[in-house]
Amino acid sequence: MTEHLPTSQVSFDENALIAERRAKLLALRAQGVAYPNDVKREHYAADVQVAFANVETWTAEALEASGDRVRMAGRLMAKRLMGKASFAQIQDESGRIQLLIQSNVLGEDSYAAFKVLDVGDIIAVEGGLTRTRTGELSVKVNVLRLLTKALRPLPDKWHGLTDVEQRYRQRYVDLIVTPESREIFIKRSKIIRALRTWLDARLFLEVETPMMHYIPGGAAAKPFVTYHNALDLELYLRVAPELYLKRLVVGGLERVYEINRNFRNEGVSTRHNPEFTMLELYEAYSTYHEVMDLAETMIRDTAQSVLGTTQVIWDGAQIDLGPIFRRWRMDEAVCHHNPEISVAECTDRDALLLHCERLKIKVKSSYGWGRLLLSIFEATVEHTLIQPTFITDHPVEISPLARESDIEPGYTDRFELFINGKEIANGFSELNDPEEQAMRFQKQVEAKEGGDDEAMYYDADYIRALEYGMAPTGGLGIGVDRLVMLLTGSTSIRDVLLFPYMRPER
């Protein structure tokens, strides 16, 4: 079907088109029918297409003889004028369907009104069904009403919304003209629903914890600061819900989870947005080994539920979520990719400093061996982890809330899940020793005073909660946006956020 659309966004005077459409709206206002709101839709495009899909059964003659009628509404996406008979296409949330519009069926006045409609207008139609000579199912329209006049023209069919920044800024237009974008966000909704269903079936309790914190804690990140006028109090948008969720475990809610927004005052990239969605859960009487099992099974089951497969392609890489995820100690992974580094050197600060210098990795003088080991891991190992891999046993220095290993002092019972070189999840056996936690908080305070903006604050109330006793607990955080990227094959986090952060338009 040929669309009556300009051939290029830059080849027409948009202001002139808008002025022309405003004139049409003015005429509608004069008639008192500019924005009617008394239409009842009974059918959707996709349902009609499926119900009458069999071409051999539902011939044009059979359709017209059946007497079936539809009442539909949607956006006019294409029109082709052909004298006394014309074709058009409308789009609703389910898909598109063709319209056959004939002056002798619709009536001369209504047909004339149809001819001056613009692509982008929202209309309601009623009629029977037929099939064209090419076999396309069509609504034979005998009632047509304009519901909403579109004042701005849509991008044309051939060039579409090619400006990526415009797609993000004007997501409402992107969703109209880009079916692939619409499908991503439908899948996002299904993914989050599948995660909830999975956890609810295992008797996890969904909870809501504060979005504004007196003390920003639960993650090493720089917070956004706000102010409560009535309380005369500085508050912080939360960087993580962790410390509040663990307070609930102290209170006896032994399996809790939250899917909500976190805010971190940091940079923007294809993997980072200052506002993002996290799934965080805690289970009493669980270790990090069991939490790894949980994370692996939940991600695999979610993929199977939403996609019908455990195999996905992400940024050109074929990812298989079906096999057991690899588990690899951080120090062993570093030594494997850097044969010059011995396992003994992984806890030797001076040796690691020399290796960082050799590898041209920039580090700060305040870094201990734990941060140095992490720096080497991030520079030489992380990007190589294509298939799902749990990196385990992180240094205490970079894990202030994780339980220290009983076997290897200086390391923790912690893991991070990497897929295609990107961190998807983080979890550990929780530190439930209040005195040890207080000592680690104090070290974080010293780091902050030394210029580390991402170091944690000292949370005295959380220490008080731990002093009442928290059961041995395992915790997990999954970046929902990155999981959606994985399961939709999206290469930028902005492609899976309806309204990603952008600098204001000038």
Curated annotation (Swiss-Prot):
Keywords attached to this entry: Aminoacyl-tRNA synthetase, ATP-binding, Cytoplasm, Ligase, Magnesium, Metal-binding, Nucleotide-binding, Protein biosynthesis
Annotated residues for binding of Mg(2+) 2: 423
Protein's name in the database: Lysine--tRNA ligase
Enzyme class (EC, first level): ligase
Originating species: Xylella fastidiosa (strain 9a5c)
Gene responsible for this protein: lysS
Primary location group: cytoplasm
Catalytic activity: tRNA(Lys) + L-lysine + ATP = L-lysyl-tRNA(Lys) + AMP + diphosphate
Cellular component aspect of the GO annotation: cytosol
